[in-house]
Amino acid sequence: MTNLLSLWREHPVFFRECIFLSLISIAFAAGFFFFLFRRKMKLAQIYFLSMMILGSLYSFVLMPLSAPDEVLHYVSAYALSSEMLGQGGRLYDGDGNLRIRKEDEEIDDWTGDGKPEEATVFGMHINRKQVEERQKASFFAQEKGYGFTLQKPVKTTPLAYFFPALGFSFARILYGSRFTLLYFGRFFNLLFFSILGSLAIEKIPMGKEILFSISLFPMTLELISSLSYDAYILALSFLFLSMVFEYQFREEKLGIKEIVWICLIAIALSPCKMVYSLLFLLCVMVSFKRFSSPWLYFIGIFAIGLSIVLPLLLVNLDAFSRYVRPQEDTVNLSNIVGQDGGMETYNRREILAQPDVY
């Protein structure tokens, strides 16, 4: 007991954090078991509660912007939030830097590191100062005015950041602090994943437990509790898988409505990462006999293909052109060892010439 008290005096910040997280864990666990045993719940409802509870815990345990590339997702959601709030006309300065609130400058240019010449991202290297700042932070913003960030947004479909941007917008309307802003964005991202994941669990005729288990992976929980657009990608991927299996095993014939739903998911998902376009090859699992007309099957394949290719080219035309015809400043993966600068990428010529490297 004496050792515990001495540790408390030496590391009060750490112990306050442990007590805070323990109380939250107990409260969430009590609420979960109350709903689980007091009323009969479907697996989809249990899934929704589990994702919201565990995701919220991960969001509190892992410091904001500590997830992979979260600072880039933060800037992308911030830019979309500004457009939602009607600030699109004055979004960037002359150098293309995003306009943000003065309150939010500490997010990607933290001054607590004692290195004014470096733009340290808050949460990238967690230390006691950052934990203390989060503990002492108020709900409302303390600074007024505007500044700019040097971080650049991710070029992808704005749909990927709609829910984090919605959270940012609510926080900015309430004049919330930078921590309020970040946690609102994280919460709305988690909420989106939990809702679509629950729909996927509800619809899929088989493999419900597999989808549930994948969602419980630590990496999955880290991503869905952050600002990452991987929460959006995973949610749509789960929903797509559930629809493909449902279409294959349902008794009713498939029609135009089912094709339209798959096309909408393809339009929303394919521009995010080109590799996810291959996921739609699973559509061939659905037999043409499941359709009301064989012609409708081929029309559906053509429509889904267009729904993948057109948004993909529209959003990722620059990246695709670098792959087909590399630029002068491109650094190929096979030549990158021992070199600095340039833009690392893959291209058709390199892959065909040295497939063992890739």
Model feature map: region roles:
Residues E10-S56, L296-I304:
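Start-transfer (signal-anchor) and selected internal transmembrane alpha helices
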Residues S226-I233:
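Short acidic/glycine- and proline-prone juxtamembrane loop motifs at membrane-interface regions
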Residues M84-Y183, L333:
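Interfacial juxtamembrane loops and adjacent helix segments
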Residues L282-Y358:
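Membrane-lumen/periplasm interface segments of specific transmembrane helices
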Residues R9-E10, E222, E258-M274, L279-M285:
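Membrane-interface alpha helices of multi-pass inner-membrane proteins
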Residues L199, L234-R250, I262-I265:
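Specific aromatic-rich, kink-prone transmembrane helix
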Residues F28-F35, T180-M206:
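Transmembrane-helix motifs of polytopic, lipid-linked glycan transferases
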Residues M41-Q45, G176-F179, S198-P218:
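Transmembrane-helix signature of polytopic, membrane-embedded enzymes
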